[in-house]
Amino acid sequence: MSVPKKRNHGKLPPSTKDVDDPSLKYTKAAPKCEQVAEHWLLQPLPEPESRYSFWVTIVTLLAFAARFYKIWYPKEVVFDEVHFGKFASYYLERSYFFDVHPPFAKMMIAFIGWLCGYDGSFKFDEIGYSYETHPAPYIAYRSFNAILGTLTVPIMFNTLKELNFRAITCAFASLLVAIDTAHVTETRLILLDAILIISIAATMYCYVRFYKCQLRQPFTWSWYIWLHATGLSLSFVISTKYVGVMTYSAIGFAAVVNLWQLLDIKAGLSLRQFMRHFSKRLNGLVLIPFVIYLFWFWVHFTVLNTSGPGDAFMSAEFQETLKDSPLSVDSKTVNYFDIITIKHQDTDAFLHSHLARYPQRYEDGRISSAGQQVTGYTHPDFNNQWEVLPPHGSDVGKGQAVLLNQHIRLRHVATDTYLLAHDVASPFYPTNEEITTVTLEEGDGELYPETLFAFQPLKKSDEGHVLKSKTVSFRLFHVDTSVALWTHNDELLPDWGFQQQEINGNKKVIDPSNNWVVDEIVNLDEVRKVYIPKVVKPLPFLKKWIETQKSMFEHNNKLSSEHPFASEPYSWPGSLSGVSFWTNGDEKKQIYFIGNIIGWWFQVISLAVFVGIIVADLITRHRGYYALNKMTREKLYGPLMFFFVSWCCHYFPFFLMARQKFLHHYLPAHLIACLFSGALWEVIFSDCKSLDLEKDEDISGASYERNPKVYVKPYTVFLVCVSCAVAWFFVYFSPLVYGDVSLSPSEVVSREWFDIELNFSK
């Protein structure tokens, strides 16, 4: 529901009832703005509409100019355009790839390429590759993100407008993003953050609109529209990057607080009415957004239906759903008496043996069997070959297929010995069994039970299915002692083991790291080598989605290695260091990702001031001193607290993450900090003092100033000074944003603030 068109510019119509009567809040009997506690949210704007239109046009044009200035430069691949340009090409070729981020934003970029008629032939392989010699619609890609980055600014403006802040406040807050060096750099390149940021901004805006509809009257058309618009925006956030969970936590916090208010007996709602509120929010903010999120994965799987570079990240079962999958082409039925190689899925190590033996005594004093070593070896080798043999007494003949969970024996071809597991401690794990081999005479004699194994299926329902190379995963299960063969690369064997991987018997049989696959059948005859086309196998969507999620989170958590431009979250609010995006050594030009340090430190100060005000207010009120008036406190504990909590939700979780972290991860929190900072200083430059320092204006019936005066002139001077400083920084650092100007070493050094390390400083 839009703000009423009739404007009284700060004057409230006369009230005939107590505006603070809690029983009137959130009820259909009280639709008018003067009958709710947050009446200032619903009252007319404090300034004429034309003033808002003027300022939103100005800041939007500034944002547009900043992002589209020389959008074509550099005509080379910059930073992570390597990844997201490449992914767009894979979508256009329908080649399956793997990435740790959800697909929505990547598909939007690919969609732009499709509209341009691009075929995806260029793969953006390295930073610095020329777009002139490798044609790609890079300007269209960049322009798409630049448009989104530009539109983020008016969305921010209108968010504060809906919260009834003055036009200059809305303009200032949005200016902090419009000419922020980090936002401009990130939203004019082929990256995901432009889509992420505008989705977060839209979420904030839509939720504010929804909340105002809630105050007027719930369950109207406008109420439903803005509820579901909030959910749609949330779905875009979570479908772009999983940091969208932080946005969910912010909106979730606000929704829970609101529901708690509705549950209050003073709200006048029955439990049935409350449950209606709860169910509508659950549906609009959680269930429908989750379905939309799943929809993008369905599109992702539908488009990427051909084998590609992402095959190796997925299971054999998943790969069989892809056209032209090498696994499907090379997959063969494993027969008894076949000579095979067996590969561990997690480490790509082959089951291997050689004539060298385990030492009689390990370094820690434990005793081994001194048997022949069985190790994991990551390279092709004759010693990786094993013959599959049936157990004694079996009538199985040559050429008969091996079935999952049948008892089998494995003969090591090179040393003519049987694979064996026994109750002797392994080299590194005293609780796990040693794996070795024994002679044919011993294996056919008293040690025979210890040579029996089975290719155990990962699912009970697959028992009895035919074993195939490449595509069927299994556990190599030891029948006698009930362990599964396992290897790892956490620590390699010492010199006596030739720095190869330990293989042992893991008592945790169903551990997913116990999975193996037959990699090759060595002794295939010509008849079996003939390729027989196979039908692409279907796999239920949810099964594909679950497997993809597991791989995404697993590989995301593995992004923990050191990176020269990685940084810790404590350094982000002050933008102490940045990231080198691109360099041109011949012309001494560079693009360096860094925040507008003046603007970012202004936000740090604003956050600190807010915390100080809140603490002081709580303490003084506890002592019976009511310094702040009612309207100031409603704004501090209303929209400002909402923005502050949202900032916390988007910032502090990064301290818990072990993966690589970069400055651009702070951009969502920075966006919210800009909204927060603009709103805070309007409150500070208002008449905040209560009418009577000894009376609590929050008590029902207490008199208070409904429209505290804003000291416009000093406030305007303050904002102009800060804006000029922010604009100066943007201009001064613009050579690092656009990379279009060669700086002398002294000019480079003059821009190395805090921990910034630039190229060409010497």
Swiss-Prot record:
Catalyzed reactions: a di-trans,poly-cis-dolichyl beta-D-mannosyl phosphate + L-seryl-[protein] = 3-O-(alpha-D-mannosyl)-L-seryl-[protein] + a di-trans,poly-cis-dolichyl phosphate + H(+); a di-trans,poly-cis-dolichyl beta-D-mannosyl phosphate + L-threonyl-[protein] = 3-O-(alpha-D-mannosyl)-L-threonyl-[protein] + a di-trans,poly-cis-dolichyl phosphate + H(+)
Enzyme class (EC, first level): transferase
Pathways involved: Protein modification; protein glycosylation
Keywords for the protein's UniProt record, in alphabetical order: Endoplasmic reticulum, Glycoprotein, Glycosyltransferase, Membrane, Repeat, Transferase, Transmembrane, Transmembrane helix
Membrane topology: Multi-pass membrane protein
TM region positions: 54-74, 137-157, 167-187, 190-210, 218-238, 243-263, 284-304, 594-614, 636-656, 717-737
MF (Gene Ontology): dolichyl-phosphate-mannose-protein mannosyltransferase activity; identical protein binding
MIR domain segment(s): 331-391, 399-458, 464-521
Subcellular location: Endoplasmic reticulum membrane
Top-level taxonomic group: Eukaryota
Assigned EC number: 2.4.1.109
Disruption phenotype annotation: Leads to diminished MID2 O-mannosylation.
Basic residues: compositionally biased ranges: 1-10
Topological domain spans for side Cytoplasmic: 75-136, 188-189, 239-242, 305-593, 657-716
Function recorded in the entry: Protein O-mannosyltransferase involved in O-glycosylation which is essential for cell wall rigidity. Forms a homodimeric complex to transfer mannose from Dol-P-mannose to Ser or Thr residues on proteins. Specifically acts on secretory proteins with an ER-luminally oriented Ser/Thr-rich region flanked by a membrane anchor such as FUS1, AXL2, GAS1, KEX2, MID2, WSC1, WSC2, OPY2, PRM5, RAX2, or YNL176.
Note: Present with 1270 molecules/cell in log phase SD medium.
PANTHER family hit by this protein: DOLICHYL-PHOSPHATE-MANNOSE--PROTEIN MANNOSYLTRANSFERASE (PTHR10050), PROTEIN O-MANNOSYL-TRANSFERASE 1 (PTHR10050:SF51)
Record-given protein name: Dolichyl-phosphate-mannose--protein mannosyltransferase 4
Organism listed in the record: Saccharomyces cerevisiae (strain ATCC 204508 / S288c) (Baker's yeast)
Gene: PMT4
